[in-house]
Amino acid sequence: MSSEPFKNVYLLPQTNQLLGLYTIIRNKNTTRPDFIFYSDRIIRLLVEEGLNHLPVQKQIVETDTNENFEGVSFMGKICGVSIVRAGESMEQGLRDCCRSVRIGKILIQRDEETALPKLFYEKLPEDISERYVFLLDPMLATGGSAIMATEVLIKRGVKPERIYFLNLICSKEGIEKYHAAFPEVRIVTGALDRGLDENKYLVPGLGDFGDRYYCV
């Protein structure tokens, strides 16, 4: 279901199961193995929800009982693009759902003094303009890195309506800023936090996702 006030923001159903998963990964005392395990579970849910929004066409197949089944098949090709480093944690979840999926990478780092993003590196599939793109980054805080990454994709010929931005936690500020720049991009998220602190980190948040996932 789309999350108001933006039609292209989709919040996962806030079930007890999902809230339980977030309780574990937000807990500062959670061990690294548990943080990885339960984060991966949420990532899988985000990927599955993202796949639900891809266009399909009707397809009829014959079953082993010699009967026809009317189903659907996906129209087009997809790829994942992770915003390095934290976004790489979401790549396996996409691979688990989509066999032989192609993965690109964009490295954007935040200036700790200005909190502004800076592009350092990009490696994308040559035919990315022909694909639907799952942009992967666990946290949407200020929106600066996500906006820059999306600009890179658009410059490579990807249409905004073919981009699906998947993240575990986002801020209202980040959504507003990102949506103002790219209203046609779909955002699929699992949690909406109340805001940012003086260091531009999500609150209540969970700390630095990349550090906790990769144990740095």
Swiss-Prot record:
5-phospho-alpha-D-ribose 1-diphosphate binds at R85, R110, D137, P138, M139, L140, A141, T142, G143, G144, S145, D208. It catalyses: UMP + diphosphate = 5-phospho-alpha-D-ribose 1-diphosphate + uracil. The modification Phosphoserine is found at S82. GTP binds at R32, R41, M75, G76, K77, I78, R102, R131. Pfam families: UPRTase. Allosterically activated by GTP. Uracil binds at L202, G207, D208, F209. Catalyzes the conversion of uracil and 5-phospho-alpha-D-ribose 1-diphosphate (PRPP) to UMP and diphosphate in the pyrimidine salvage pathway. Belongs to the UPRTase family. This is Uracil phosphoribosyltransferase.
